[in-house]
């Protein structure tokens, strides 16, 4: 089993931007959505339109799963297919208005739209706070070690 610290896992999360957000609809149906996030201070921040279906689902049930996909490749041989490494965790999602955020974080999230009042007015920020443990696959191990599922798996507490 891969030995990882909480700090190492957070570093990998902070160095990436894409994840898959899992949630449950009001009808108890599983749903997932690919999202782009910003990680800061032990939370992940995701922008969305206020009227998006994922926002409605999260308002009804804040319990989520999030899987960060970390691209892997063989140096100098990009045609060889290698599965992505992953970090998966459970979390609690809350909804925040863009104006409730620190200005620097708002700029990181909305980039060129950070000063666009109309865009911000129709947006909401999903804040995911991880709970429990990070479950990893292929993080902190070589490509060869990823072939061994026992060596490739790892766990680390969300909070140190």
Name each model-derived stretch.
Residues 1-19:
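Short, basic/aromatic recognition patches
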Residues 4, 78-160:
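Charged, gly/pro-rich active-site loop segments
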Residues 15, 29-31, 85, 122:
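Residue-level preference for beta-strand/loop junctions
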Residues 17-50, 56-58, 65-69, 77-79:
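Short beta-strand segments
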Residues 19, 44, 64, 93-94, ...:
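Short beta-strand segments in beta-sandwich/barrel cores
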Residues 50-51, 131:
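A generic "binding-loop/recognition-motif" signal
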Residues 51-53, 121-122:
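A short beta-loop-beta micro-motif enriched in histidine and acidic residues
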Residues 61-73, 83-94:
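Active-site-adjacent structural patch at catalytic or cofactor/ligand-binding sites
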């Amino acid at each position: 089993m891969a030995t990882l610290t909480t700090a190492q896992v957070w570093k990998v999360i902070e160095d990436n931007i894409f994840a898959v957000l899992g949630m449950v609809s009001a009808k108890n149906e599983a749903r997932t959505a690919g999202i782009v996030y910003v990680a800061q201070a032990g939370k992940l921040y995701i922008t969305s339109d206020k009227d998006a279906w994922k926002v409605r689902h999260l308002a009804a049930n804040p319990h989520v799963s999030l899987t960060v996909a970390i691209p892997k490749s063989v140096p100098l041989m990009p045609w060889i297919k290698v599965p992505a490494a992953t970090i998966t965790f459970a979390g609690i999602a809350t909804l925040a208005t863009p104006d409730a955020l620190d200005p620097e974080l708002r700029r990181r999230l909305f980039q060129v739209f950070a000063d666009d009042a109309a865009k911000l007015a129709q947006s909401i920020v999903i804040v995911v706070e991880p709970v429990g443990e990070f479950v990893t696959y292929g993080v902190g191990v070589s490509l060869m070690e990823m072939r061994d599922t026992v060596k490739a798996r790892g766990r680390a507490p969300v909070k140190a």
